[in-house]
């Protein structure tokens, strides 16, 4: 039986990641000390802040990793808190040595696919589609984030059952994680159901901070849940993340489709790309296998066809999500149907759209788009 060494313990800890940052504890300077006394091991770790919500997860994972070493005896994990200087160094390291926060997704070399999920009107399931696509892609092994840009009507934390508040490392915000998805919302910063009463400049600043001050890490996909319509936030997103592509959500009825066209036609001014249209609340599948078009039919294809003409580029209908009460039930429970019932008609349809988005990313990942909007 080989003796336990400090090097072996450190190697074991290098396989443990900080769940918020997604990097090894050893790389983040979070291992304060390792003491080996025969087969017994004492490890002291640095936490980024006092009261770190991930403390039990970090210490538990560290203990489990060390206990896998052959011949190890008792393993004790204790914690300390980083100093202000250590937090500043960590922040600088995570930002690549850049002092001031920048928006990583605005970098032309960014390989993160950014989708702004939009609708012409409220109540069409835009937020539900956002979170379901996000968790579906996370379940496929991708690194995914959701930015709730619907400041007035924020709903993402509830749809993902996220009650954990973000933590801060110096002036960098660590987003909560739910269902494998990093998320940030103004709902994390207001008490209860308090309203947010802001004018346009404040909305712009909030979106800018969520993009720049939050540590998103190396995401494959970022979904931005926009408010309905074509107001200040839609313009801010076009200015701040020129490469963001639009996903338009509508329902089958003509009235909703006509309004959805307006949401997509903003790209004529911003020179963004419409990645596709999602038709929600399509035909309901009845117990006998027949279908019922509760809200009519054809709205999604109508929007896709019309936007193809307006933009001069093919805008596909990515999919039709059947009207399914369980989609609402799982949304209320914070357990999106895409992962709680992936084989259901709605869950399967969402999964197919997620697969199309993956294929699109693999074919044109990282290609920058132009922007014709004047920065404020």
Region spans (language model):
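Short, hydrophobic beta-strand segments
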Residues: 41-49, 115-117, 245-246
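Walker A/P-loop phosphate-binding motif and the immediately C-terminal alpha-helix
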Residues: 113-151, 264, 277
């Amino acid at each position: 039986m080989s003796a336990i060494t400090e090097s072996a313990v450190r190697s074991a800890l290098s396989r443990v990641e900080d769940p918020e940052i997604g990097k090894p504890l050893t790389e983040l300077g979070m291992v304060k000390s390792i003491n080996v006394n025969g087969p017994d091991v004492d490890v002291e770790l640095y936490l980024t802040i006092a009261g770190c919500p991930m403390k039990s997860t970090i210490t538990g994972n560290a203990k489990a990793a060390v206990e896998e070493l052959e011949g190890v005896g008792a393993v004790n994990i204790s914690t300390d808190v980083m100093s202000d200087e250590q937090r500043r160094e960590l922040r600088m390291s995570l930002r690549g040595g850049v002092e001031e926060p920048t928006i990583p997704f605005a970098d032309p070399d960014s390989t993160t696919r950014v989708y702004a999920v939009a609708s012409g009107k409220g109540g069409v399931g835009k937020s539900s589609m956002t979170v379901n696509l996000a968790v579906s892609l996370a379940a496929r092994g991708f690194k995914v984030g959701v930015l709730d840009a619907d400041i007035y009507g924020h709903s993402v934390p509830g749809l993902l059952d996220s009650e954990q508040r973000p933590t801060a490392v110096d002036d960098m915000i660590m987003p909560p994680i739910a269902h494998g998805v990093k998320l940030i919302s103004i709902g994390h910063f207001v008490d209860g159901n308090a309203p947010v009463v802001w004018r346009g400049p404040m909305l712009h600043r909030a979106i800018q901070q969520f993009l720049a001050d939050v540590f998103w890490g190396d995401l494959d996909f970022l979904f931005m849940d926009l408010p309905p319509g074509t107001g200040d936030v839609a313009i801010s997103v076009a200015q701040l993340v020129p490469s963001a592509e639009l996903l338009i959500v509508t329902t089958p009825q003509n009235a909703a489709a006509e309004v959805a066209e307006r949401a997509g036609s903003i790209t004529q001014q911003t020179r963004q790309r419409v990645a596709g249209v999602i038709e929600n609340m399509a035909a309901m599948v009845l117990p006998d296998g027949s279908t019922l078009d509760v809200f009519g039919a054809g709205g999604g294809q109508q929007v896709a066809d019309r936007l193809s003409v307006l933009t001069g580029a093919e805008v596909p209908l990515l999919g039709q999500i059947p009207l399914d009460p369980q989609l609402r039930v799982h949304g209320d429970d914070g357990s999106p149907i895409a992962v709680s019932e992936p084989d259901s008609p709605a869950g399967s349809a969402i999964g197919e759209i997620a697969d199309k988005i993956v294929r699109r990313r693999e074919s044109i990942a990282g290609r920058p788009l132009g922007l014709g909007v004047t920065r404020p």
